[in-house]
Amino acid sequence: DCAATVISAKVDDPTGYARIVRDENGNLRAIVEQKDADEETLKINEVNSGGFWFDCQLLLSVLDRIKSDNSAKEYYLPDAIKLLLEDGRKVGAFTAQCSDTVLGANDPAQLEQLNEIARAKGYSC
């Protein structure tokens, strides 16, 4: 009965990705964008894939509370996770077994890395 589930991955180099912050029991506590992370959070190697599943009604109930009061002045969808947690809702994070399947490209270097992975696996168009 989760209000939302996020797909995460553990990676060797989390640079550029939002970090998954868990409590001592392994429960999701926050998703922190790299540019908003402190030194401790930057050490975390579990990252947000950007894949979310939401209970639609619960998502709609928090969307108007998302603010752009962060370093990028952007509206972050992961803030919906924070608001659901603040409302006492259960939110889960599922860690993908193969991080290659959930990586994204935030810059040309990461795109090249994804292309190299695809080539190594024999994927081409």
Question: Where are the language model's segments positioned?
Answer:
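Conserved beta-loop-beta/alpha segment of the NTase-like Rossmann-fold superfamily
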Residues: 1-25, 52-56, 61-67
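Catalytic-core segments of class I nucleotidyltransferases/pyrophosphorylases
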Residues: 29-102, 106-124
